[in-house]
Amino acid sequence: MDRLMKKLGLLALCTGLSFAVHAVTPQAEAPAEQNVKIDSVVVTGARYASDIRHLPMTVSVVGREKIEQSLQPSLLPTLTEQVPGLFTTARGIMGYGVSDGAAGGISLRGLSGGSGRLMVLIDGHPQYMGLMGHPIADAYQSLMAERVEVLRGPASVLYGSNAMGGVVNIVTRGMREDGVKTYADIGYGSYNTLQTEATNRIRKGRFTSVVSGSYNRTDGHRADMGFEQYGGYAKLGYEISQAWNVRADVNVTHFNASQPGTVTNPMADADQRITRGMTSLSVENNYGRTSGALSLFYNWGRHRINDGYTVDPNDTNNPKDYRFNSRDDMMGVSWYQSARLFRGNRLTVGADYYRFGGEAWNRYVGGDRKGERSDIADKSQDEVAGYVDFRQDIGGWLTFDAGLRVDHHSHIGTEWIPQAGLSFHLPHTIELKASASKGFRYPTIREMYMFPPQNPDLKPERMWNYEVAYSQRLLGGRLTYGINLFYIDGENLIVAVPREGTTPLNMNTGKIDNAGVEAQAAYRISEAWSVAANYSYLHMENPVIAAPEHKLYTEAGFARGRWSVTTGVQYVAGLYTSVKANGRGTENTEDFVLWNLR
């Protein structure tokens, strides 16, 4: 407990000095910005821009203002604070790393991205390691995000496998009004920690561009815990006509991370060199009654990892004479078109094609096999899917929504995924929602073909989520609050089952039986002062590591002109640090409090 408290305390102190420089060409506010409340329009729950009140599922929105106020190079700490039910692990001042000893695990309602049950998207495109099937936490940087939309609950109808527990959709930055805006941020603090970021945005007539770059590094609060990252993001857009536009973007980041092991069992030479990249091209149309898009995307990664060794002289774990290497990629084509066929109606149809995979090998750098290569895996797989979503407003007080996806995997077969929900628009700006939705996940290439306990005969994981949500806006929208109740029933979870006399085997024997409550409230006291809070309680019949039972965050903020101050307190209780596996082992939990002042 004391060690965890010390680590978390360091996060609040890591930035001792921070300042920002802005160069802005003033322009009149765009009409769209005057009339549309940004946090009421989302794209994650419907593919097209949709009023959040008409969605049967729950979507949390974290805007650019919150992202900038957090002064964090990574988006994950901000999401942990602002989104009830979402928790991310951390191991130090900066950086998450990959492989053994990594942090940055994202869990939502007890479903983890590390196990492929939570999907991260960038502008609606899936982002995960092609072989392992999990998100890469250090790739999700604040510099690219205009806002982040978190759909809490299954989103498999729209996004397929890995969206089993929900999605985190990073909506990239743009420029709404003509002009040039440049932003720079530099921070320096404890343990030789440096974080920098610069962004230039331009809009001239029909042309828009965004170019960002960053460099971040730290020595870490322990020996052999250094982290260094540099990367850049660029986005170009052009409005072909009032109805058609095209955009393309590219994001590349490289980081070097070291993993020091535990305090009681430290490690040496556990170093990682990781490069991740993504690029996409989209052509979009919007005719009012109908809108849609055709997009192509390509993600890639190059990993070089030294697993390291324990420094205990009594341990037989000696320096490794090999290095793990991998190349992975994922490409895809997505198309959707949404149309208003008659009054109050919206019909969306779409199709997706994904191809993902890669190769992994060990390269020997010493010993008798020096210079040799030992292959681990070289696999690629395909998914093709079609989906339809039907929405109907009835009498101005009720919205009915139903969707169905048919998803085919080249190795596993076909999966059908339905969902349905109701949204009641009641007097006094009350919104009441009820939904039932199926989520699923195909086994990853790692689970089927890489490392014991691999099993090529695995089946998809499946779950159902049942949810009721209540929310209300008061005082002209200055006060908002909401509460969600959910129950998750899942089966066929992939677990490593021990076998006598041999290695464990991955099998579809696990179950999910989770239930919980999530609540949030925000109050704009005046133009300068605001307060907000969120809380989540999670009951897990089968607990998982890094999923807390209780999470509370409260904050107060003051902003006037160019000056702003925000303070927040996060309380986490019942955070599982170890759980029983197949009836063996012990369950341990820890609690902590983290205070931030920015």
Residue ranges of model-derived segments:
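N-terminal Sec signal peptide and the immediately downstream disordered periplasmic leader
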Residues: M1-T80, Y238, A339, N596
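Transmembrane beta-barrel wall of Gram-negative outer-membrane proteins
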Residues: Y188-R217, R222-N256, A270-A293, Y298, ...
